[in-house]
A protein has these predicted regions:
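Short beta-strand/loop motif that positions the catalytic acidic residue
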Residues: 266, 272-274
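Glycine-rich nucleophile elbow surrounding the catalytic serine of serine-hydrolase chemistry
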Residues: 156-165
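Cap/lid segment of the alpha/beta-hydrolase catalytic domain
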Residues: 68-142, 191-192, 461, 470-474
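Alpha/beta-hydrolase fold nucleophile elbow
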Residues: 145-157
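C-terminal, loop-rich substrate-recognition/catalytic regions characterized by aromatic stacking residues
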Residues: 298, 308, 312-657, 661-677
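Short terminal hydrophobic/aromatic SLiMs and anchors at protein ends
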Residues: 1-2, 9
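Accessory cap/linker subdomain of secreted extracellular hydrolases
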Residues: 93-94, 102, 168-265
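N-terminal cap/lid segment of alpha/beta-hydrolase-fold proteins
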Residues: 33-69, 436-442, 455, 496
Length: 677
């Protein structure tokens, strides 16, 4: 039995590594930064304001703006999220939005319909209603007397997604966006599926969102209507995972909100940002290659967090860089930002493998365009003597991996807040099919997506293949540089899966995640193939044997560029003053300014019997409290996913209390057919 599991979660620190995917609400405590208190503009804060919509719904907003904005209007920068400005994103909001306001912007945090203090109901992520509401919000902002009429959108993860999606709707007042840790393709590169395989992280994300939507609005802001709003949400709470499991291929559901369907719909300038440790990096090269609008990109070493607070470091002065972008596009100030290379990326040095890195050494490199003309594929061939630069014989080799291969793979979307990154790959490598080079004579650096092409056959109609590119150190330790997943039923694309014919050879192509990494001389480049990668992906119903008859690896080798050394240094990280909180007891924290007490605890468990792929199960439990003085609420959620050969089975429960009185209890027990998974 392989178990990953259980950890307590403390309020304001909501992401144990094993929870897989939680849309980073908090700020890593170990990220050093300069706290700025003296700004060019005095700041006025509007704690709570209603934005009216045409259908009568009101969205709740919190706004920071210069004190004199009514006399000297300023551009607005919108962050539009479902994570509760009051009790969810308060920590990172305090660091970011006053900083923007102090430099001459109206920074606006709006709760999406059905979340936080806003009216209405939320039924799914990235719904058309969410976009329609955003269009009204932007028009409302542009019309305010304190706004110059120019609006930008900035957000990470969900807020990065909807920034791209709303930009594609072309609201006239939206002049530019900054999108962080997002994707242009909701099926190909989001938390739900990877290469047609079901990601375990999608369960963690669905379970987190299931609990997050149970939070009540604050009576101090909305008055006595809080209870009716809360009960209405609880009684209409959707089971998100059931929705997402009902779309196991790239159909119209996933095409909605995927801006890759029409890149040219986006006409405003785009600044795309992510980190190599994050799960959301692959969209950036595609956005650079396919957008027609002005665009820039920045890829650092970071996990899933804003670059001024993210780990692994080094952090940068992201807020200063954001201001340069906004000043250029929202204030028509020539900051020189568009004179710089299209892409700046962190070239990561080789490090000992570990599930947590506080910092990743490296240097900044830059490319004037993407695809970069100076990067060409360097081809290696799979042969009987390993990876070679010339083609040679490969005796067919079979692999049928243990169901426990992948235990050192880390989370699909690391947050850098704990041991959630890939560790030493030697254990997984020992149960995989390996091809590797001799020790390198010279250093090699890659920038972009490695591509692996294989001729394979399976003895079962369904099979997964995990492909890992590793840096093997002289001491034998193995550092994962990149990886890709392919459910072989999806060999011809994500829209039209087809069962394999056992014994028939197929040529498959696996594009690995984009990477920026160095292989030092004396190290070896290793390709590792396995038919399982648990608990990152759900196993096939039968444990297949896949035979490899031949193949190649194309590495995007980047030559040394002397111009890299001439890049101007990025500024050191700065933020506004953090929100003051007081830990009261394990798992409970008080927001001092509001007197609100937030409690969070829970656990997450994954299990598989090494001899039975149908034994896979994931479970998550959350218990959360929100209280102030005599007002007390509590809500608990549980979710469980398991399977048969033909179906995914999903069990869930939610119970909520006001004080000690139960006010709502619901249960779900549903089954979704397995389709080519």
């Amino acid at each position: 039995m392989i178990g990953q599991g259980a950890g307590n979660v403390k309020a304001g620190w909501r992401r144990p590594a094993d929870w897989g995917y939680i849309d980073g609400l908090s700020t890593p405590k170990r990220a050093a930064r300069l706290i700025v208190t003296d700004f060019p503009h005095a700041i006025r804060e509007i704690e709570h304001l209603w934005i009216p919509l045409a259908d009568g719904t009101r969205l709740a907003a919190r706004i920071w703006l210069p004190e004199d904005a009514d006399r000297k209007p300023v551009p607005a920068v919108l962050e539009y999220l479902p994570y509760r400005k009051r009790t969810g994103t308060f920590e990172r909001d305090a660091l970011t939005h006053p900083y923007l306001a102090g430099h001459g912007y109206a920074a606006v945090r709006v709760d999406i319909r059905g979340s936080g203090e806003s009216d209405g109901l939320l039924f799914d992520e990235y719904a058309l209603q969410e976009q329609d509401d955003a269009l009204e919000v932007i028009a409302w902002l542009a019309a305010q007397p304190w706004c110059s009429g120019a609006v930008g959108m900035m957000g990470i993860s969900w807020g990065g997604f909807n920034g791209l999606q709303v930009a594609a709707r072309r609201p006239p007042a939206l002049k530019a966006i900054i999108t962080l840790c997002s994707t242009d393709d909701r099926y190909r590169d989001d938390v739900h599926y990877m290469g047609g395989a079901l990601l375990r992280a999608g369960f963690g994300w669905a379970s987190f969102l299931f609990g997050a939507m149970c939070y009540p609005p604050d009576p101090a802001l909305v008055g006595e209507s809080w209870r009716a709003t809360w009960l209405n949400r609880l009684q209409n709470l959707p089971l998100f995972l059931e929705i997402w499991l009902s779309h196991q291929r790239r159909d119209a559901y996933w095409q909605h909100g995927s801006v890759c369907e029409d890149y040219h719909a986006i006409q405003c300038p785009v600044f795309a940002v992510s980190g190599w440790t994050d799960g959301y990096t692959n969209a950036i090269p595609r956005l650079l290659a396919h957008l027609a609008a002005p665009r820039k990109a920045l890829i650092g070493p970071w996990a899933h967090a804003y670059p001024h607070v993210a780990l692994p470091g080094p952090q940068i002065g992201f807020l200063q860089e954001a201001l340069r972008w906004w000043d250029h596009w929202l204030k028509d100030i020539d900051t020189g930002v568009m004179d710089e290379p299209m892409l700046r990326a962190w070239m990561t040095e080789s490090v000992p493998p570990a599930p947590f890195h506080h910092d990743l050494p490296g240097r900044w490199v830059a490319e004037p365009a993407w695809p970069p003309p100076g990067i060409t594929p360097h081809r290696l061939h799979l042969t009987d003597t390993g990876l070679q630069t010339t083609a040679a014989t490969l005796t067919p080799r079979a692999v049928c991996s243990s169901l426990t291969v992948g235990k050192d793979g880390g989370s699909w979307c690391p947050f850098g807040s704990g041991p959630d990154q890939a560790g030493d790959q030697q254990g997984d490598d020992a149960q995989s099919l390996l091809f590797e080079t001799s020790p390198l004579d010279t250093r090699a650096e890659i920038l972009g997506a490695p591509v692996v092409t294989l001729d394979v056959a399976s003895d079962k109609p369904l099979a997964n293949l995990a492909v890992r590119l590793c840096d093997v150190h002289p001491d034998g330790t193995s550092l994962r540089i990149s990886y890709g997943i392919l459910n072989l039923a999806y060999r011809d694309g994500n829209e039209s899966p087809a069962l394999l014919q056992p014994g028939v050879r197929y040529r498959i192509r696996v594009q690995l995640n984009d990477a920026g990494s160095a292989f030092p001389s004396g190290h070896r480049i290793r390709l590792a193939l396995s038919t399982n990668y648990w608990p990152m992906i759900w196993p096939s119903p039968d444990n297949p044997t896949v035979t490899v008859f031949g193949g190649t690896v194309d590495l995007p080798i980047r030559p040394a560029e002397t111009s890299d050394a001439l890049l101007p240094a990025l500024p050191e990280p700065e933020t506004a003053t953090p929100e003051r909180t007081t830990p009261l007891r394990p798992g409970v924290v008080r927001i001092d300014r509001l007197g609100l007490e937030l409690g969070t605890e829970g656990n997450f468990r994954v299990h598989i019997d090494p001899g039975d792929p149908l034994s896979a199960v994931v479970e998550m439990r959350q218990s959360q409290t929100v209280s102030r003085d005599n007002w007390r609420t509590r809500f608990e959620t549980t979710t469980r996913l398991f399977c048969t050969r033909d179906a995914f089975n999903l069990q869930a429960a939610m119970c909520a209390w006001e004080a000690d009185v139960e006010v709502c209890r619901r249960t779900w027990n549903t089954s979704v057919p397995r389709e080519f998974i």
